[in-house]
Amino acid sequence: MKLPQGFRSASIAAGLKSTGALDLTLIENQGPEFKAAAVFTTNKVVAAPVVWSRQVAKGEIVRAVVLNSGGANACTGPQGFADTHMTAEHVGQLLGVSPGEVIVCSTGLIGELLPMSKIIAGLDSIAPVLDDMGLQTSAQAIMTTDSVPKIATAAFDGAEFAGIAKGAGMLAPALATMLSVIMTDAVVSDKAQEIFQRATDRTYNRIDSDGCTSTNDTVLFMASGASGVVVSDHDLEKILMTVCGSLAEQLIADAEGSTKTVAIKVLNASSEKDAVEVGRACARNNLLKAAIFGGDPNWGRVLAAVGTADANMDPLAIDVKLNGVQVCTNSSPDADKSSVNFEARLVEIEIDLKIGSASATIKIGRAHV
């Protein structure tokens, strides 16, 4: 699959995975522009690549990103950071760019040093063969417990967008053992970081699998400007919402042990923040998830979960629909819950707070506990 103009990539099985699968990929932005935006984990324990890449991203110029699976390089002390630095330095030498413009991402087991000789040898092998047809293999190279690669593309007025992502377990709001790279050949404004942050907040940060966040989460956006097509801030946000939204849906569908996809839609909250808080309270509630997994349309557990949220509400005026059936009106019984069918994979929970106009949807990729 082809990358947007200005981008090249290549991948290799460097020997980081015992399976012999692809585990190392290098993506280069050849410009003429090198604008970048990034969002990282909120976990206080962060991997060495995140420490490095946060500093790189502050400059909002990224010329290359190297990603490996098969090892997280997290909780590895000073040597782990030195290894990340070495990786960026080596990529810089191979591509003739500053290491301070190279993002490094790792995913895999925590607490083990990376086999740097294999990474260096792998980079030496793929740097000379970078081309514009490596989207699929780059998506495969970052997989860990994922069962399928995640890819999303979009086009707008002659500009191309393409994204890859990985993440199957530990999915939770505020990123989710997740790596993602989104590329475009469009010309974008200096507000790319602000726009990308909003798109991330409303897509990746509204999915949940098991309530855990990772040490390594990194979502990167790069724009080469190679198409010459100028995309407005408004249109850029819409496109990023589409691409990130598609990747987030794919992550949810492939969450480890997932048997249900649960969409929790909160309506008429006093603010979007409150709507998100209520949705997350339900997404994290083990009693509610147990009911869903057991096929029990127990709307009382929905109300109980809603009540734990730090959000404005009238506890006597909440409506609940389960798969379209209004089982609760004004926090009291309505339609018989026996008319609700939870057999399908998709379960829809609609919570109407009736105190404002804001809304948000949180999606769960694993309904059992």
Where are the predicted features?
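A structural signal for small-residue-enriched, beta-sheet-centric alpha/beta enzyme cores
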Residues: 1-68, 72-83, 92-366
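Generic structural marker for isolated residues within well-ordered, non-membrane alpha-helices
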Residues: 88
